[in-house]
Curated annotation (Swiss-Prot):
Reactions the enzyme catalyzes: 4-(trimethylamino)butanoate + ATP + CoA = 4-(trimethylamino)butanoyl-CoA + AMP + diphosphate; crotonobetaine + ATP + CoA = crotonobetainyl-CoA + AMP + diphosphate; (R)-carnitine + ATP + CoA = (R)-carnitinyl-CoA + AMP + diphosphate
Cross-referenced PROSITE patterns: AMP_BINDING
Name of this chain's protein: Crotonobetaine/carnitine--CoA ligase
Classification of source organism: Bacteria, Pseudomonadati, Pseudomonadota, Gammaproteobacteria, Enterobacterales
Function: Catalyzes the transfer of CoA to carnitine, generating the initial carnitinyl-CoA needed for the CaiB reaction cycle. Also has activity toward crotonobetaine and gamma-butyrobetaine.
UniProt keywords, alphabetically: Ligase
Length: 517
């Protein structure tokens, strides 16, 4: 089923500008509260000027350009400006440091970078090291350093025409983006995303939340992440909705921003839900227009119930990853939700639970979640320059091995158990980290929790819990272990616990377990 119809991203924006014109397309709010707003017509002009900017710097179809930016309108300009001339965006996680960023530049062979003043010192050092092909930096900000190979984005963009000066032939099969995975356990892999992938994501995710042109979709997710791009921005623009992009997440400001922009849809991760719940209760908690909150794993039933009751919202569960582009399993519009199920497989996909010999399993049995899609269309095309990694993850028939454990019930609802690499082997027993984290998170003194496996000479692995307490609370080891013993099987009780002020996280809120031992 082809729902894109050969329409690439250049055509999409030209059509949107013509159809929606002066309707508000994008609202951006900075951490300082400065608001910038663009209609569909004016946003398309900004995108065209940015495309011409890249052309003036020598960028042509197939060239790769890196973006290292926090949320800002310029990210949107660059993303679609590159797509309009057939060039390829390589977004870099804004939290990455020098060595990690240089590795991505080297592996994607990027010569041009767009970044902001706060990240410039790091990239100046990278250029001086001559370890990457990077030879030019386009800088967003008021002050421009007097360095060779540096240009000012705003000044250069303002000089460009709002009409495209370079229009190569584009196909929906062309690569639009190389998005590097978060790499919480190893080096990231470059996920190749096509024009078709992004167009499909817009239609699919709009269907998933029944998005209309009178909706306002607000997100705090980072623009360099698949969630912001393919479950927020693309559906919002594809449906002619208003997309509200906030620079950073603030638990204190979140609900005021929801009300200020009259948001009807937003997306949340567990970290957001937990930090919102520790804010003081207010009479305005349920005074908003939200009809759906897109939710990504993982949350205990107690946390879910407390959040939905306090704020009067529905959580729409969506399961996916960078490689699936969208939430390929999830709740459907109008369906009764079956918590803790992650929902049913969406249109254009198939899903199975398979054993270690790659054989389908019956309902109720735990195995690997496998998804069938069309590479380069409904799932990613490949890992950039990594054919062996692509072959391990993606079968020739289009079956993608997610690396996640789960099961399905007799009615076709799927249930997530854990990342297969997130299982702890303890004395012959497989212990799910997610299961333990959900149990421990119910302790009233605990704000955040993660468990990891550490080497144990006798039992393969021991279990260690890292804990963040609610403000002003104290928790003794005796109290912690007693709680665990009363709420889980003996072999699942952690052997060690450590209290921390925070936990290391990547851009999507996932805890970076390789930094904890």
């Amino acid at each position: 089923m082809d729902i894109v119809g050969g329409q690439n991203l250049r055509q999409m924006w030209d059509d949107l500008a013509g159809v929606y014109g002066d309707k508000t397309a994008l609202i951006f709010e900075s951490c300082e509260g400065i608001v910038r707003q663009f209609s569909y017509a004016s946003l398309n002009e900004e995108i065209n000027r940015t495309a011409n900017l890249f052309y003036s710097l020598g960028i042509r179809k197939g060239d790769r350009v890196a973006l290292h930016l926090d949320n800002c309108p310029e990210f949107i300009f660059c993303w679609f400006g590159l797509a309009k001339i057939g060039a390829i965006m390589v977004p870099i996680n804004a939290r990455l440091l020098g060595e990690e960023s240089a590795w991505i530049l080297q592996n994607s062979q990027v010569s041009l970078l767009v970044t902001s003043a706060q990240f410039y010192p790091m990239y100046r050092e990278i250029r001086q090291d001559n370890s990457t092909p990077l030879n030019h930096i386009c800088l967003i900000g008021e002050q421009l350093p007097a360095d060779d190979g540096v240009s000012h984005f705003s000044q250069l963009q303002a000089r460009q025409s709002a009409t495209l000066c370079y229009t190569p032939v584009l196909s929906t099969d062309d690569t639009a983006e190389i998005l590097f995975t978060s790499g919480t356990t190893s080096r990231p892999k470059g996920v190749v995303i096509t024009h078709y992938n992004l167009r499909f994501a817009g239609y699919y995710s709009a269907w998933q939340i029944a998005l209309r042109d009178d909706d306002v979709y607000m997100t705090v997710m980072p623009a360099f992440h698949i969630d912001c791009q393919c479950t927020a921005a693309m559906p919002a623009f594809s449906a002619g909705s208003t997309f509200v992009l906030l620079e950073k997440y603030s638990a204190r400001a979140f609900w005021d921003q929801v009300r200020k922009y009259q948001a009807t849809v937003t997306e949340c991760i567990p970290m957001m839900i937990r930090t919102l719940m520790v804010q003081p209760a207010a009479p305005t908690d349920r005074q908003h227009h939200l009809r759906e909150v897109m939710f990504y794993l993982n949350l205990s039933a107690q946390e879910k119930d407390a959040f939905t009751e306090r704020f009067g919202v529905r959580l729409l569960t969506s399961y996916g990853m960078t490689e699936t582009i969208v939430g390929i399993i999830g709740d459907r519009p109008g369906d009764k939700r079956r918590w803790p199920s992650i929902g049913r497989v969406g249109f254009s996909y198939e899903a199975e639970i398979r054993d270690d010999q790659n054989r389908p399993l019956p309902a109720g049995e735990i195995g690997e979640i496998c998804i069938k899609g069309i590479p380069g269309k409904t799932i990613f095309k490949e890992y950039y320059m990594q054919p062996e990694a692509t072959a391990r993850a993606l079968e020739p028939e289009g079956w993608l091995h997610t690396g996640d454990s789960g099961y399905q019930d007799e009615d076709g609802y799927f249930y997530f158990v854990d990342r297969r690499c997130n299982m702890i082997k303890r004395g012959g027993e497989n212990v799910s980290c997610v299961e333990l984290e959900n149990i421990i998170s119910a302790h009233p003194k605990i704000q955040d929790i993660v468990v990891v496996g550490i080497k144990d000479a006798i039992r393969d692995e021991a279990i260690k819990a890292f804990i963040v307490l609610n403000e002003g609370e104290t928790l003794s080891e005796a109290e912690f272990f007693s709680f665990c013993e009363n709420n889980m099987a003996k072999f699942k009780v952690p052997s060690f616990m450590e209290i921390r002020t925070d936990l290391p996280r990547n851009c999507s809120g996932k805890i970076i377990k390789k930094n904890l031992k």
